[in-house]
Design a protein with these regions (language model features):
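Bacterial Sec-dependent N-terminal signal peptides
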Residues: 1-26
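Alpha-helix boundary/interfacial micro-motifs
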Residues: 17, 21, 58, 181-183
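Surface-exposed, polar helix/loop patches in the mature regions of secreted/periplasmic/lumenal proteins
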Residues: 89-135, 141
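Active-site nucleophile-His-acid catalytic modules used for acyl/amide transfer and hydrolysis
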Residues: 144
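Residues in well-ordered beta-strands of folded domains
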Residues: 9, 38, 141
């Protein structure tokens, strides 16, 4: 009886350890973790070049939602399945949480003409505040640093998160050249270019982030 209890106790500890295990970048590369594209976090963003951002209410209430929805609505252009070389069934996109989170973003007071950057620490602090529906696997979020009309470029921190703990397991600043017809598509073009840049960096990541 004592031996049975001991075995049960050890097995329970093993299950607890498995449940609390954090995913890492090697788990992504090996296909052991499912990946959820969470979308775009605009709460840290500034909008550089006042002439390019004349309707802050529309940016917050319309475009932030639209930019995120494009990730699910147009997977051929915005899916991360191919850039991250994911297997069938390993990838999904779920942007609802970011759409809700972005309601706290302040656009009007963050339209500027000066240069602006954020730190990795700011990225981590923002991620720590997320309320996430998915609790298993690795989440990918673009913590947007700036939409820079002067440079015609979108700057974002591509951030990989262990969904269970909300721990940032890797983040890197990447830029995407904006381009497209109309305000929404112009900046969505920057997201598309960031996706392409991820594809070009994947091989290097898989070798160095072990």
């Amino acid at each position: 009886m004592i031996m049975k209890k001991l075995v049960f106790f050890v097995f329970t500890l093993f299950l607890a350890a498995e449940a609390s295990a954090q995913f890492t970048m090697p788990d992504l590369f090996s296909g052991k973790a499912k990946v959820v594209f969470l979308g775009l976090d605009f709460t840290q963003a500034k909008y550089i070049g006042r002439i390019g951002f004349t309707d802050p209410a529309a940016i917050k209430n319309q475009h932030m939602v639209s930019w995120n929805n494009l990730i699910e609505a147009e997977p051929k252009k915005f899916s991360l399945e191919k850039p991250l070389k994911l297997k069938d069934g390993q990838y999904t996109a779920q942007v609802t949480d970011m759409i809700k989170y972005n309601k706290a973003a302040n656009v009007e007071d963050n339209i500027i003409d000066d240069e602006y950057t954020i730190t990795e620490d700011k990225v981590k602090k923002s991620v720590a505040k997320y309320s996430l529906t998915d609790k298993d696997g690795i989440g990918v979020v673009y913590v947007v640093e700036s939409l820079n009309k002067t440079a015609e470029t979108l700057y974002a921190w591509v951030t990989f998160i262990d969904l269970a703990s909300k721990k940032v397991i890797y983040t890197e600043k990447i830029e995407g050249k904006a381009g497209g017809f109309g305000f929404r598509n112009y900046w969505a073009g920057g997201v598309y270019k960031i996706n392409n840049e991820i594809a070009s960096r994947y091989k290097g990541w898989s070798k160095t982030l072990k």
